[in-house]
């Protein structure tokens, strides 16, 4: 088995196990059974935003190599500016806090925890009686990727491990070299501003806080994992603090726009035009 397939299989196995555990512990068997009985209607209700997200992801995957060349030639060269703003902050983080235990934890979080963090909301919010929150999450994901791709094109910047190789160690690849086979398929060294790991993780945490009445057990898990991902991006030498700050801004902006773009009254399962009248609307609390 190639390193890429080995890592991908491991990630899928870990994420599948965590999704099962979280679905049972957070959503609960009763709500899962109800979701299964109404799955077709709920999926139909989200078809448009799923299509938009798929288009954005495909465009990102196909266009990234060409846009990278555009960024390298015409983009704003931000590496020196970022380094001038924060200097050796990431190097200080590693020099001060790096231990074998923390490196193992943050490496796991960056790959496995992050994949789970982004996957579980799709199941959790699909299990709500109304799909408005799920549609907002998917729109926020699409906005993160679309705006992130645009910024990657406009801003060309290398990460701290490339700028300060004598001071910053690429801890993720030093401890788990096979992971590079997977990350190289979705990232390049100049894809650092903003940190999409940060923006997407913070997006999930923000929705978890907004839906805490529906899923009180999920909120602390999501916030902890999200903050762990944020720290991991710097601890592992992948992103600058500046990238992380920009990631927070992108996350909050994407959530705000998702709430503006998705009308909670539109085509909701259980509404009159959904064909299932008389159902109560317990999803109100989930809309924040």
Annotate the PLM regions.
Residues 114, 118-156, 218-222:
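Interfacial segments of alpha-helical transmembrane regions
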Residues 25, 108-129, 198-218:
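Transmembrane alpha-helical segments in integral membrane proteins
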Residues 93-115, 186-198:
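Individual transmembrane alpha-helix segments
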Residues 175-288:
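Membrane-embedded catalytic cores of phosphoryl/pyrophosphoryl-handling enzymes
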Residues 1-63, 77-80, 212-217, 253-288:
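Haloarchaeal acidic low-complexity proteome signature biased toward cell-envelope/secretome components but also
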């Amino acid at each position: 088995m190639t390193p890429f397939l080995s890592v991908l299989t491991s990630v899928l196995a870990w994420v599948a196990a965590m999704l099962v555990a979280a679905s049972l512990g957070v959503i609960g068997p009763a709500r899962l059974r109800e979701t299964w009985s109404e799955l077709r209607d709920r999926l139909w209700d989200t078809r448009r935003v799923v299509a938009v997200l798929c288009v954005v992801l495909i465009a990102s995957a196909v266009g990234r190599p060409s846009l990278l060349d555009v960024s390298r030639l015409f983009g704003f060269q931000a590496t020196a500016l970022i380094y001038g703003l924060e200097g050796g902050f990431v190097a200080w983080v590693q020099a001060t806090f790096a231990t074998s235990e923390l490196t193992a934890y943050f490496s796991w979080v960056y790959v496995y925890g992050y994949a789970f963090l982004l996957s579980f909301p799709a199941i959790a919010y699909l299990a709500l009686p109304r799909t408005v929150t799920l549609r907002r999450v998917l729109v926020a994901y699409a906005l993160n990727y679309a705006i992130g791709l645009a910024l990657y094109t406009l801003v060309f910047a290398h990460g701290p491990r490339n700028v300060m190789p004598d001071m910053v160690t690429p801890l993720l690849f030093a401890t788990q070299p096979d992971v590079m086979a997977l990350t190289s398929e979705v990232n390049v060294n100049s894809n650092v501003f903003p940190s999409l790991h940060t923006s997407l993780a913070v997006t999930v945490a923000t929705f978890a806080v907004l839906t805490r009445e529906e899923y009180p057990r999920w909120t602390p898990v999501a916030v902890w994992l999200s903050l762990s991902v944020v720290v991991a991006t710097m601890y592992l030498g992948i992103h600058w603090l500046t990238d992380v700050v920009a990631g927070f801004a992108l996350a909050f902006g994407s959530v705000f726009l998702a709430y503006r773009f998705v009308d909670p009254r539109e085509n909701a399962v259980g509404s009159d035009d959904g064909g299932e009248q008389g159902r109560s609307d317990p999803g109100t609390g989930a809309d924040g």
